[in-house]
């Protein structure tokens, strides 16, 4: 199993009661996650001082509530830069667990000895791109 453990700008800080508290660069977000089935106390400071909270609707979907969060911002993973933006369906336009795949194809590109183009199907929005710093 490959583990995405090289992040400096992303981390799951805590999770409880169907939600996870994440740090995306300098901002913290709370988003629902159906895999979080435990009900532990939400003692981390970030639960009270988040920058964005996605509230799931009982009818499906949901909406964001923002606290001092810009419309979009950037985070970095090694030599890659990503633009983030909260979407109406809880996502930010980036799947951090894909970092192991980025590491793998970054090595392949470096060793190809020729220019390479990559289509990132995990980031389909025109503003969500990665580039060398």
Task: Kindly give the residue locations of the regions a language model identified.
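Non-catalytic substrate-recognition/targeting regions of SAM-dependent transferases
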Residues: 5-24, 29-96, 103
